[in-house]
Each structure stands twice: as structure tokens, then as C-alpha cells.
């Protein structure tokens, strides 16, 4: 029997909705694979499951960190694997769009346990992505072949690990795939339709109180909190400081979310193990259930 069912794909493709319905049908639980939903108080802007949804189906790996804490991929992997090994439910649903979180589980990535050094990161980031990627090519050409030149997050992390340990990150990584069966399901739709979904979700977040959430978080933790510089929060923060109008903030959020979704699609499409389904199919739940039940 399949131990773990992964539901992945770009943002706004309906992963959470499908997972909720699937979990209720299968009597399962949900493990989040979202790098921002792990943080408490960041709710609306991360599209975190509502309290009603959490009551309907048990959710794990959300609200497990304070906003000023750091959750590394290694931290996530350790907690997720512990849950997978201990929860007396099968199958479990691993749901989200954070590719590294999912890869750390399905491929059993061996991850360097190197804590982030924010002072070093600030110094490295100030060099600019082009210069930083050039450094990566020099100190770790193997990692540079795997990291896109326009991926500042992974570039920065790889260079940071080298500067801290003196050992290339590629030499510290490896894989130890789990011995339990995994089924990977991906949701996707045409880019035009995905853009419509992103528009609708952005409007809904504003209606649900995103502006108030950002204002509260800025007052409580300070506007320079790194999480407040992430997608959906940074744009509203610009509105609150008077830099742009609310309409412009919404337009920027849609634009940046669309760009992010394209990167996610590229990431997940590179995995041949993922079976893809049309997110807009009217019988999506039934089709996915049939796929799961196939021998």
C-alpha cells in the first residue's frame, strides 16, 4: 500500500482543496510542504488552511515556528520524517509547493546542517546575483551546474555553506531514498487560466484581511522581518508605507505570484515521477482517487 501521496504543483492550482477532499475520502491526514505556513501568525498571505479546515482534517507542519525563528530544509526534513514514521495513518498526504521540502522527503536528500548566517548572507547578497553566481562557479562548479543562474536563493545558500564550512555544498549532499512507496500527483493548468486563479486568490486575500495582517505583523515584529519581504507581504507593506496604491499592490502581487508560479512549474516538471492532472477538471477528485487505487 502507498505510504505517502504527494500533491504538488504551482501556487493557486488548488492543491489544498484537493488534498482536503481527498483526506476526508481516504480518512487521511495532511502534512504541509510549504516553507511559509510553518510560521505562526502568517496566515492569510500564505493561504494557510483555515481553522475550520484544520478541524475537518488534521494538519501537521503548520504553525510550528515563531516568525523570528528559522526553519531550514534539514529541520523540515527531520520533523516530516518523524511524523511519517510515527503517524498510524496510511496513506499520508504531503501537500505543498515548496520543491525542496518535497524533494528532501521523496528523494531522501542528505542536507548539510549549517545554520544560516544572516550577516554573511547580507554581505554576499550585496554583491548581486551575477557576481555571486560567478563565485559559485569557482568554488563549487558541480552545484553551479544544478542551480539556475537566476536562482538567488539556492545560489546564496550554496556559497554561504562553502564560506562557513570550507567544503562545497555538492560534496555534502547525497540521497537516501525512503523504503516506503510514494505516489506523486501534480496539478497544473494553462498559464492564462492560472493567472486568472492568481487574480482571484489575491482579491480574496485582500477581502479576508491581508492588509490588516501585514499591518499587525509590521507593528509586532518590525517591517524588516525577513518574512515580511516575501511574496504578498512585501507588496502590501509598500502600500502601507505610501509608496504605492492598494490597486498597484494587488497588481504587483499578481505579477510576482505569476513569476513564482512559472518557476515552480519548471521545478516540478523536471521530475519524471510526478503524474500530472488538470486542475480545472470537473471530476478531479474522482479521477485522482481512481489513480490512487490502481494496483
From Swiss-Prot:
GO biological processes: tRNA modification
Summary of subunit composition and partner proteins: Monomer.
Record key words, sorted: ATP-binding, Magnesium, Nucleotide-binding, Transferase, tRNA processing
Site (Interaction with substrate tRNA): 98
UniProt function note: Catalyzes the transfer of a dimethylallyl group onto the adenine at position 37 in tRNAs that read codons beginning with uridine, leading to the formation of N6-(dimethylallyl)adenosine (i(6)A).
Enzyme Commission number: 2.5.1.75
Pfam families: IPPT
Stretch list, region Interaction with substrate tRNA: 34-37
Gene for this chain: miaA
Superkingdom per UniProt: Bacteria
Catalytic activity annotation: adenosine(37) in tRNA + dimethylallyl diphosphate = N(6)-dimethylallyladenosine(37) in tRNA + diphosphate
InterPro entries from the UniProt entry: Dimethylallyltransferase (IPR039657), IPT (IPR018022), P-loop_NTPase (IPR027417)
Cofactors required: Mg(2+)
UniProt binding sites for ATP: 9-16
High-level lineage: Bacteria, Bacillati, Cyanobacteriota, Cyanophyceae, Nostocales
An example Gene Ontology molecular-function term: ATP binding
Transmembrane intervals: none
Family: Belongs to the IPP transferase family.
Uppermost EC category: transferase
UniProt protein name: tRNA dimethylallyltransferase
Amino acid at each position: 500500500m502507498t505510504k505517502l501521496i504527494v500533491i504538488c504543483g504551482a501556487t493557486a492550482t488548488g492543491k489544498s482543496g484537493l488534498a482536503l477532499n481527498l483526506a476526508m475520502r481516504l480518512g487521511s491526514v495532511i502534512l504541509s510542504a510549504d516553507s511559509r505556513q510553518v510560521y505562526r501568525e502568517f496566515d492569510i498571505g500564505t493561504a494557510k488552511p483555515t481553522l475550520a479546515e484544520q478541524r475537518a482534517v488534521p494538519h501537521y507542519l503548520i504553525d510550528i515556528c515563531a516568525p523570528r525563528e528559522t526553519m531550514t530544509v534539514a529541520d523540515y526534513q527531520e520533523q516530516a520524517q518523524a511524523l511519517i514514521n510515527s503517524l498510524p495513518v496510511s496513506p499520508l498526504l504531503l501537500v505543498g509547493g515548496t520543491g525542496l521540502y518535497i524533494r528532501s522527503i521523496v528523494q531522501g536528500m542528505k542536507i548539510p546542517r549549517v545554520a544560516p548566517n544572516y550577516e554573511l548572507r547580507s554581505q554576499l547578497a550585496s554583491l548581486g546575483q551575477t557576481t555571486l553566481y560567478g563565485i559559485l562557479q569557482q568554488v563549487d562548479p558541480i552545484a553551479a551546474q544544478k542551480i539556475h543562474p537566476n536562482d538567488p536563493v539556492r545560489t546564496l545558500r550554496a556559497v554561504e555553506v562553502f564560506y562557513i564550512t570550507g567544503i562545497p555544498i555538492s560534496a555534502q549532499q547525497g540521497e537516501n531514498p525512503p523504503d516506503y512507496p510514494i505516489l506523486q500527483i501534480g496539478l497544473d493548468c494553462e498559464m492564462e487560466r492560472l493567472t486568472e486563479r492568481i487574480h482571484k486568490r489575491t482579491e480574496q486575500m485582500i477581502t479576508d484581511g491581508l492588509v490588516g495582517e501585514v499591518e499587525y505583523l509590521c507593528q509586532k515584529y518590525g517591517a524588516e522581518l525577513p518574512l515580511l519581504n516575501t511574496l504578498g507581504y512585501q507588496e502590501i507593506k509598500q502600500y502601507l508605507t505610501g509608496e504605492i496604491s492598494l490597486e498597484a499592490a494587488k497588481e504587483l502581487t499578481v505579477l510576482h505570484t505569476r513569476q513564482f508560479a512559472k518557476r515552480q512549474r519548471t521545478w516540478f516538471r523536471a521530475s519524471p515521477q510526478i503524474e500530472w492532472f488538470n486542475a480545472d477538471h470537473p471530476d478531479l477528485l474522482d479521477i485522482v482517487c481512481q489513480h490512487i487505487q490502481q494496483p
